Amino acid sequence: MPDNLYATNMSLDLSITGHSTALPQRKSRSTYRFKAANSYVDESLFGSSGVRVDQTLQWNTAPPSQTPLLWSPGEIKENKKTSSCRPKSTPAGTPRKKIQYRVKSRTPSYCDESLFGGKVEECTWDAPWVKKEDTVKIRPLLWSPSPRLVQQSSMQNAKQGPLRAVHPPETSDSPLGTHKGLGAFWKPPESDSDYSPSPFSARQRQSTPGRETVRSASCSGRVTARRGSVKMQERPPWK
């Protein structure tokens, strides 16, 4: 009996010590497991791979049953003039410039706005937080100039002759009315006897005697300057 027990204990020890210990499994990041399955592809769809084409075989192209709806531009015959006008091709190795603008299609586009529903009407009511005092009533400030009638005779005279200064109409009360018949009114008087002052100028002289002397001196200076300029503009006889 003890021999049998010892034998059984030895067999148990061998059986226990003979098994390898299981290592702890590491936790993978993903909890999903991928299962690979064999796939099948019908290679006859891509043509017969075993049959080789004989290169010596001559192919006979049959005439087309109908004319294809294709368009190709005609051959362009280049002339010497056209070839010289074209810019020369850039040499090899030069970097190409990048296109700054994208190519846009030139075909007109159409959009049916009825697909997006009806148009939104503009709100005519005021916001609740806006006061009546703050609202501004906008009124159109329209203005049109008064019509001006231009006579045709005045337009023709303006085109033909030079521009002239416009003077107010002369009356009998004005100082110019007394000297209307005299031709040398704008010329300075040669002596004191030729000068006949008007009542209007006499009143001014009584009121402001100092201004009249300054004005007469300035007028005489202008006349002498004009006369001097006329003498300088005269051409010598040998020209």
Curated annotation (Swiss-Prot):
Residues 62-97, 149-239 are annotated as: Disordered. Residues 149-159, 203-221 have a biased composition (Polar residues). Residues 129-158 are annotated as: Interaction with RBPJ/RBPSUH. Changing L12A: Results in nuclear accumulation. Changing I16A: Results in nuclear accumulation. Keywords: Cytoplasm, Neurogenesis, Notch signaling pathway, Nucleus. Tubulin-binding protein that acts as a negative regulator of Notch signaling pathway. Shuttles between the cytoplasm and the nucleus and mediates the nuclear export of rbpj/rbpsuh, thereby preventing the interaction between rbpj/rbpsuh and NICD product of Notch proteins (Notch intracellular domain), leading to down-regulate Notch-mediated transcription. May play a role in neurogenesis. Belongs to the RITA family. This is RBPJ-interacting and tubulin-associated protein 1. The lineage of its organism: Eukaryota, Metazoa, Chordata, Craniata, Vertebrata.
